[in-house]
UniProtKB/Swiss-Prot annotation:
Coiled coil: none annotated. [2Fe-2S] cluster binds at C122, C195. Homodimer. GO terms for cellular component: cytosol. It holds the Pfam family ILVD_EDD_N. InterPro entries: Dihydro-acid_dehy_C, DihydroxyA_deHydtase, DiOHA_6PGluconate_deHydtase_CS, ILV_EDD_C, ILV_EDD_N, IlvD/EDD_N. PROSITE patterns: ILVD_EDD_1 (PS00886), ILVD_EDD_2 (PS00887). It comes from Histophilus somni (strain 129Pt). Belongs to the IlvD/Edd family. GO terms for molecular function: 2 iron, 2 sulfur cluster binding; dihydroxy-acid dehydratase activity; magnesium ion binding. Binds 1 [2Fe-2S] cluster per subunit. This cluster acts as a Lewis acid cofactor. This is Dihydroxy-acid dehydratase.
Length: 611
């Protein structure tokens, strides 16, 4: 029978000092011997996805103590990628993921906590906490802050849906008036919550459902809706149940590594492909798998991308649907249900509810259940009220969207494409692979050949795009922006958005060893591995080189002879594979991150051979 980890600091005369300190935190005599459950919050006023989380930790804590646990809350940092975007702040975004994972480990192990409830929401916070949960392997429940309502405004007598990316694109479009640009800016992000499309934050929160580590609805129920409160309350109750099963019944099936198995990672990646999720999820799943000691690699992603269809298109891949529409269509359980019926899901993987994912689908998929409470839950909709307050409204759609032919979520028979929403490409310029979100690529450019125009940094690329250097037919190459070369692997949302602003969204490709925001669409290929700073061939591309991209056949090639490539490699070996004439201040903390960082195909985790 496993002993409570917290007994290390609460039992025996030698721990009198520790107990005295625990008492000073509010613990009573009868609390010693109960599981101490860490409530890992991420409240901050810097991030709209986290601005409403201040009271969520204590909401969960009260429920934990109601059912027999002792709750102790602490906070992690949280970076807003949208606010950090387009300047030096973005260098810190991806490194913050690993810092979050480490900080959770430090707090939980230093204080010998028995279990965790992870309250996350935005881009690097959910992955960081996920890495920590799989590293620590103690009972854990994830509950997120929930998606933002879609922005809405009236243009040309039509109501249109908006998000952050629309504000960025229109703000840089010289043909859009100041008044219209400001109108869009003011309307794009109306409430608290993670940005309203299938960007990185929402993608990752959806994936925790597929991994089995969060409750149904976690990825899709709006931050503003009263129903989300029930998810927080249920998380508090469920973590106590998991503690009892593990510490009192020796049931190891409730542990994160028992739930997030290789098959569960396959399910999560299949979900991401089916819903056209962010390419960042690839990076984070690879990193999480390493923490779980699961052999999940780019080869698995390639395998799945060839068989899983694209069942849902959500902003930024279309402006018709946002996360509020995914929820109305049955949420993640509905997409997993369609994958299951298509024979593309491992239905025997386990969840924190003690069910198999197949049993959970049977209970929560609106196509399978007639339970009125389940249908009511998935009718939860937006109120259209500007607010930073959680649980403010109880608006509901009249009906759920169960149209699997033309609705937000499709069946395999009526899929947007049979080829999935993400693809891994490989070739001489990306020997270890690169990633493209095919759900966001126009069919006319699935095959593309163009001349390279090379930039040594994101900043130079932005200047080149807005300055008219980039023309139709170009392949924009942005290099030395990988985990090591940045350092920090910046997101390239501004370059991709500005290509659209300049009318080049369907006329150019973009290739980088950096990464993309979940808000990116278009022929945007990232995670090029090995990265330039690690000796990847993207580091030897020259202006005018022809790059051929063939998404249907999963190929990307630099059309330069082997002899010429050998000469260029030798030249870069002498130069140390560093960007030419880049002016960038890099702090000591970022230099340390860059020194240990691996390329994107390894999840940009630390290189353990250097330790």
């Amino acid at each position: 029978m496993p002993k409570l980890r917290s007994a290390t600091s609460t039992q025996g005369r030698n721990m009198a000092g520790a107990r005295a300190l625990w008492r000073a935190t509010g613990m009573k005599e009868n609390d010693f011997g109960k599981p101490i459950i860490a409530v890992v919050n991420s409240f901050t006023q810097f991030v709209p996805g986290h601005v409403h989380l201040k009271d969520m930790g204590q909401l969960v804590a009260t429920e934990i103590e109601k059912f027999g646990g002792v709750a102790k809350e602490f906070n992690t940092i949280a970076v807003d990628d949208g606010i950090a975007m387009g300047h030096g702040g973005m260098l810190y975004s991806l490194p913050s993921r690993d810092l979050i994972a480490d900080s959770v480990e430090y707090m939980v192990n230093a204080h010998c906590a028995d279990a965790m409830v992870c309250i996350s929401n935005c881009d690097k916070i959910t992955p960081g906490m996920l890495m920590a949960a799989l590293r620590l392997n103690i009972p854990t429940v994830f509950v997120s802050g929930g998606p933002m309502e879609a922005g809405k405004t009236k243009l040309s007598d039509q109501i249109i849906k908006l998000d952050l990316v629309d504000a960025m694109i229109q703000g840089a479009n010289p043909n859009v008036s100041d008044d219209v640009s400001e109108q869009i800016e003011r309307s794009a992000c109306p409430t608290c919550g993670s940005c309203s499309g299938m960007f990185t934050a929402n993608s990752m929160n959806c994936l925790t459902e597929a991994l089995g580590l969060s409750l149904p609805g976690n990825g899709s129920c709006l931050a503003t809706h009263a129903d989300r409160k029930q998810l927080f309350l249920a998380a508090g109750k469920q973590i106590v149940e998991l503690c009892k099963r593990y510490y009192e019944q020796d049931d190891t099936s409730v542990l994160p590594r028992s739930i997030a198995t290789k098959e569960a990672f396959d399910n999560a990646m299949s979900l991401d492909i089916a819903m056209g999720g962010s390419t960042n999820t690839v990076l984070h799943l690879l990193a999480a798998a390493q923490e779980a000691e699961v052999n999940f690699t780019m080869a698995d992603i390639d395998r799945l991308s060839r068989v899983v269809p694209c069942l849902s298109k959500v902003a930024p891949n279309t402006q018709k649907y946002h996360m509020e529409d995914v929820h109305r269509a049955g949420g993640i359980m509905a997409i997993l249900g369609e994958l299951d019926r298509a024979g593309l899901l491992n239905s025997q993987t386990r969840t924190i509810l003690g069910m198999s994912i197949g049993e959970q689908i049977a209970k929560y998929d609106i196509k399978l259940t007639q339970d009125k409470a389940i249908h009511k839950f998935f009718r939860a909709g937006p109120a259209g009220i500007r607010t930073t307050q959680a649980f403010l409204q109880d608006c509901r759609w009249d009906t759920v969207d169960d149209d699997r032919e033309n609705g937000c979520i499709r069946s395999k028979e009526f899929a947007y494409s049979q080829d999935g929403g993400l693809a891994m490409l490989s070739g001489n310029i990306a020997l270890d692979g690169c990633i493209v979100k095919t759900a966001g690529v126009d069919e006319s450019i699935l095959k593309f050949s163009g001349k390279a125009i090379v930039f040594e940094s994101q900043e130079d690329a932005v200047s080149g795009i807005l300055g008219g250097k980039v023309q139709a037919g170009h392949v924009v190459v942005i290099r030395y922006e990988g985990p090591k070369g940045g350092p920090g692997m910046q997101e390239m949302l501004y370059p991709t958005s500005y290509l659209k602003s300049m009318g080049l969204g369907k006329a150019c490709a973009l290739l980088t060893d950096g990464r993309f925001s979940g808000g990116t669409s278009g022929l945007s290929i990232g995670h090029c591995s090995p990265e330039a700073a690690a000796g990847g061939l993207i580091g030897v591309v020259k202006d005018g080189d022809i790059i051929e991209i063939d998404i249907p056949n999963r190929r990307i090639e630099l059309m330069v002879s082997e002899e010429e490539l050998a000469e260029r490699r030798a030249e870069q070996d002498k130069l140390g594979w560093k960007p030419a004439n880049r002016q960038r201040e890099v702090s000591f903390a970022l230099k340390v991150y860059g020194y240990f960082a691996t390329s994107a195909d390894k999840g940009a985790v630390r290189d353990k051979t250097k330790i």
